[in-house]
Amino acid sequence: MKEQKWIHEGLITESLPNGMFRVRLDNEDLILGYVSGKIRRSFMRILPGDRVKVEVSRYDSTRGRIIYRLRNKDSKD
């Protein structure tokens, strides 16, 4: 049976060593996020101020996996 996970959106507030980030979720929770392997392989750069989607386990709601970086509205990409 596959573990159910919650998906939240949040804002990167701080960059930590080894691909870890401090993420403030939209519900004002502060969690520790780590980059998923798919994002790590595609060499995406995640910086403080970026909006991301985070997958949070129901068993440990203090850590989450960053699964998607949302586009900034003001960027020229």
UniProtKB/Swiss-Prot annotation:
Keyword Signal: no
Main location: plastid
Pfam (any one): eIF-1a
S1-like domain boundaries: 1-71
Quaternary context: Component of the 30S ribosomal translation pre-initiation complex which assembles on the 30S ribosome in the order IF-2 and IF-3, IF-1 and N-formylmethionyl-tRNA(fMet); mRNA recruitment can occur at any time during PIC assembly.
Protein's organism: Garrya elliptica
InterPro entries named in the record: NA-bd_OB-fold, RNA-binding_domain_S1_IF1, S1_domain, TIF_IF1
Cellular compartments annotated: Plastid, Chloroplast
GO cellular component terms, A-Z: chloroplast; cytosol
Function: One of the essential components for the initiation of protein synthesis. Stabilizes the binding of IF-2 and IF-3 on the 30S subunit to which N-formylmethionyl-tRNA(fMet) subsequently binds. Helps modulate mRNA selection, yielding the 30S pre-initiation complex (PIC). Upon addition of the 50S ribosomal subunit IF-1, IF-2 and IF-3 are released leaving the mature 70S translation initiation complex.
Domain of life: Eukaryota
Keywords on record: Chloroplast, Initiation factor, Plastid, Protein biosynthesis, RNA-binding, rRNA-binding
Annotated protein name in UniProt: Translation initiation factor IF-1, chloroplastic
Family: Belongs to the IF-1 family.
PROSITE patterns: S1_IF1_TYPE
GO molecular function terms attached to this record: ribosome binding; rRNA binding; translation initiation factor activity
